Each structure stands twice: as C-alpha cells, then as structure tokens.
Amino acid sequence: TSVVQRDKVGIGFNNIAYAYDINSKKPYRHIAVIPLDLNGNGKIDPEEDFYATSTELNAAIAEGKYPSPPARNLFLVSNGKPMKPEVLAFLEFILTDGQQYAPEVGYIGLSSDILEEELFKLQE
C-alpha cells in the first residue's frame, strides 16, 4: 500500500483490508478505490456508488451488488472429515464467535443459512 501511496501514477490490486483504514473505515490517505461501472452505462450510478467506506462496500458485497469476481468465497479444505478436537473447535469458532471479526479484516460474514449448514456438518 505505501509504495502505491507514494507513486502518483501507481496502481495496485488488493484486498479491501489493505485499501481501507480499519478505524475510520475510509480509504487510506492517497489511495483511491476505483468503482466498477456495473451496468456498463459509462458512469457510476447512485446504486453503484458504495466505495466511500469499507462498511458500505462490505454491505454491497454481502447483498450481492458487488460481483464475483472480484469478490469471492473462501473455503477451508481437509482430507476427509476433521477428527481432532482442536481442529473441530477451531472450525466451530470460525462459524460462531469468529464471525464477528470478519468485517474488521475486510471479509464478509457468512449468512445464517450457510452457518447453520456448516455447523450441522461438524455434528455429523
């Protein structure tokens, strides 16, 4: 981020967490988040203008307004069902209390349907 900030013609491709200040929720100084013209009409319409804060952008991603890609799902993969108690406890944490930390670091929390489905898989 700092290299792009110092280069007036610099361009960077990054995770939201690296473009927005975690405290102010606004883009870092000297960083401009370039919006996407989602409907291709050559301008950013009000319903496409959700880049002022990370809170607005995260909400747009969660609501499906921001496309995939560049927004995308992340998965954890294992070789068979995890059996170790500490691994199961970690996965349960991710799907419960850990969800509260997702927005702070530029991720979108999972929907209640997905959380329920994945927690059920841990119980099987």
Where is each model-derived feature located?
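Exported/periplasmic ABC-transporter solute-binding proteins
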Residues: 1-124
